[in-house]
């Protein structure tokens, strides 16, 4: 008897990447881009078995002939047909399981429209016939993964960033702040500033190349002005990158100008606060008695917090905003790219969690709105 037969499935559907696997594992089995690609041209070869859509890595590898679409934008599902394709691909092609045999734990961004989680619930029970499911808030799972029950999580992925204060395992909804500035916006910004250097990137396929440059070469400066001066006076910060066609490009101050937009959204023409100020504002919306615990347990999570230097910069910026005697600690776990998934894996394998699942029977009795009562 194989253990996977009763294991819950944990699926973290991000705006950029989908992470999926089995509860109890320490890392996701499948990580692939949340992309659905459709051919740009009419097929001419008969009998090649061309598909009308491709999902994930296959869409990525054929990106030259496809138009790529992300069904999740800013953490909200905007195209349910494509989303269903991604889930189908997750269960049948990546994990190779029958969803009707496993409970499924899904994740969601805080402050999402209610209709979003209702529709998720409906598709799981009606399309995939799952025996049970649950929808958890992403940031809460990240905190679980760091081994805490109290702290403030700055979760920044590809589509959305948010700060969620959590006390004794409960998210404090009045103090959650959301910032629609994340990895995808930084990729677009890098495309723009590379154009100023004379390199042109425009198509959906070329955007993926720029995303790779961003992930490999960008970092956060501790002191932006000083770093700009260093970049102007020497070539010590320049790095080169080889494009798929063999051309080599050089990038200098773009390496830290790109992620600087997280701290200065005005770079993108946005009037919002940076991630440091958003985190501070979120803490200030909480009860005065628990702020000390939040300052001392500030947890970073998500792919957009993977830039070298981001934790030191957060430490510096929040120290400047907070009361001078306050102890501030920024926790940046090395596996934070996957900490939402890891937290889901921990939660779904707890014995105390087993009564939390929404069962098929409960769904049949109450309909999709059951999700608001059972998942908070």
From Swiss-Prot:
<dbReference type="InterPro" id="IPR020902">
    <property type="entry name" value="Actin/actin-like_CS"/>
</dbReference>
<feature type="propeptide" description="Removed in mature form">
    <location>
        <begin position="1"/>
        <end position="2"/>
    </location>
</feature>
<dbReference type="InterPro" id="IPR004001">
    <property type="entry name" value="Actin_CS"/>
</dbReference>
<comment type="function">
    <text>Multiple isoforms are involved in various cellular functions such as cytoskeleton structure, cell mobility, chromosome movement and muscle contraction.</text>
</comment>
<keyword id="KW-0378">Hydrolase</keyword>
<dbReference type="GO" id="GO:0005737">
    <property type="term" value="C:cytoplasm"/>
</dbReference>
<dbReference type="GO" id="GO:0005524">
    <property type="term" value="F:ATP binding"/>
</dbReference>
<keyword id="KW-0558">Oxidation</keyword>
<keyword id="KW-0547">Nucleotide-binding</keyword>
<dbReference type="InterPro" id="IPR004000">
    <property type="entry name" value="Actin"/>
</dbReference>
<dbReference type="GO" id="GO:0016787">
    <property type="term" value="F:hydrolase activity"/>
</dbReference>
<dbReference type="Pfam" id="PF00022">
    <property type="entry name" value="Actin"/>
</dbReference>
<dbReference type="GO" id="GO:0005856">
    <property type="term" value="C:cytoskeleton"/>
</dbReference>
<keyword id="KW-0206">Cytoskeleton</keyword>
<comment type="function">
    <text>Actins are highly conserved proteins that are involved in various types of cell motility and are ubiquitously expressed in all eukaryotic cells.</text>
</comment>
<protein>
    <recommendedName>
        <fullName>Actin, clone 403</fullName>
        <ecNumber>3.6.4.-</ecNumber>
    </recommendedName>
</protein>
<feature type="modified residue" description="Methionine sulfoxide">
    <location>
        <position position="48"/>
    </location>
</feature>
<keyword id="KW-0963">Cytoplasm</keyword>
<keyword id="KW-0067">ATP-binding</keyword>
<dbReference type="InterPro" id="IPR043129">
    <property type="entry name" value="ATPase_NBD"/>
</dbReference>
<comment type="similarity">
    <text>Belongs to the actin family.</text>
</comment>
<keyword id="KW-0007">Acetylation</keyword>
<feature type="modified residue" description="Methionine sulfoxide">
    <location>
        <position position="45"/>
    </location>
</feature>
<feature type="modified residue" description="N-acetylaspartate">
    <location>
        <position position="3"/>
    </location>
</feature>
